[in-house]
Every structure is written in structure tokens, then in C-alpha cells.
Design a protein with these regions (language model features):
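A short, internal acetyl-CoA/4′-phosphopantetheine-binding micro-motif in the GNAT/acyltransferase core
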Residues: 90-102
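C-terminal "cap" of GNAT-fold acetyltransferases
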Residues: 124, 131-135, 149-174
Length: 174
């Protein structure tokens, strides 16, 4: 369900205070300012999960030349561009009670967003991007995301920075 002013969010704790605070304190404000849109699922007693999406791009100016060449090879016979459209998963959280179950709610969200962007998207969108927390990188790798260049892989391997830029090419599921 898309978050709205009329919604009273039910209890939620994903084990990450920053994500919890975002859902209860910032998500609606970001949405009202047209910066992102937050969706959530509850069971009548508690919030099971939420995710926030915003527009993004993969841009040449932000990447190494080698990685940008790799991205451009995905578009043979097309006019060269300086960027390609994407949607960013800005926030994603699953209630601790629903984490590490046989059915992965996190994978469910990613698969839902992937299919949604291919079948229901109102604008062009080739990629899904995420600035993954270091601890979440294995989850995103398992779900088909790649590092946005070798420098991001090194950041992960050396545990530099809080997040690692990753992407998923939606043409993998078309």
C-alpha cells in the first residue's frame, strides 16, 4: 500500500534505528515534497515491511571510464547518452519478526519492484539502483545486483564507507 497522510502506521522494528526513524519520521515528508514514494505492508497488528522509491540515473560523470564503457555496451546501435534512467530503492526494511524466514520478504520486495518497473512503470527505466549498507551487500548480490564498478567492489571488500553503490539491469527479466 502506498503511504498516505491518512495512514496510521502500525508498530515496526527492522533492527536498524535509521530505517525505523525514516519510516515514522521522514517518509511522509519526503513523499509530500515529491522526493520519494513509500510503500508498506502490514498484517493488521504490525508493519511487516516497507520500501521507498525515487527516480535516479546511472551517469557517466559519476563512474569510472571503464565501467561507463561496460554500461554503454548494453545499448548497441543507439545514440550515445550521458546517463540512463533508473529507479532507486532509497530505503528497504523488513520487520525483525519476519527476517530470516524460509520466504524472504526482502527478496519478495526486490522481485516485486523488478516486475513492477518492467510491466507497470509509467516512464522509461532500465536499471534499479541502491546504495546498499555494507551488511546488506550479500543480500543484493544474491538477488542479482552488481557492484557499480570495480571501485565499489573494493569499497565493499575493504569495508570502506557505510554504503556501496549497486545496480540491477531490468533487461535480465524481460
Amino acid at each position: 500500500k502506498r503511504l498516505s497522510d491518512a495512514d496510521e502506521l502500525l508498530p515496526f522494528d527492522c533492527g536498524d534505528e535509521d530505517l525505523n526513524n525514516y519510516l515514522f519520521s521522514d517518509a511522509l515528508s519526503y513523499q509530500n515534497q515529491l522526493l520519494s514514494v513509500t510503500y508498506y505492508l502490514d498484517n493488521g497488528d504490525e508493519t511487516i515491511l516497507f520500501f521507498s522509491l525515487s527516480n535516479d540515473k546511472i551517469a557517466a560523470i559519476e563512474l569510472t571510464n571503464g565501467f561507463w564503457r561496460k554500461i554503454k555496451t548494453l545499448f548497441p546501435h543507439s545514440k550515445p547518452r550521458k546517463d540512463y534512467p533508473a529507479v532507486k530503492i532509497g530505503r528497504l526494511g523488513v520487520n525483525v519478526k519476519y527476517q530470516h524466514q524460509e520466504k524472504s520478504w526482502g527478496a519478495f520486495i526486490l522481485n516485486y519492484v523488478k516486475q513492477w518497473m518492467v510491466t507497470e512503470n509509467k516512464t522509461g527505466c532500465r536499471f534499479i539502483t541502491v546504495d546498499a549498507y555494507q551488511s546488506a551487500v550479500p543480500f543484493y548480490l544474491k538477488n542479482g545486483f552488481l557492484f557499480m564498478g570495480s571501485q565499489e567492489r573494493v569499497r565493499y571488500e575493504k569495508q570502506k564507507g557505510d554504503t556501496v553503490a549497486m545496480y540491477f539491469d531490468l533487461m535480465q527479466i524481460v
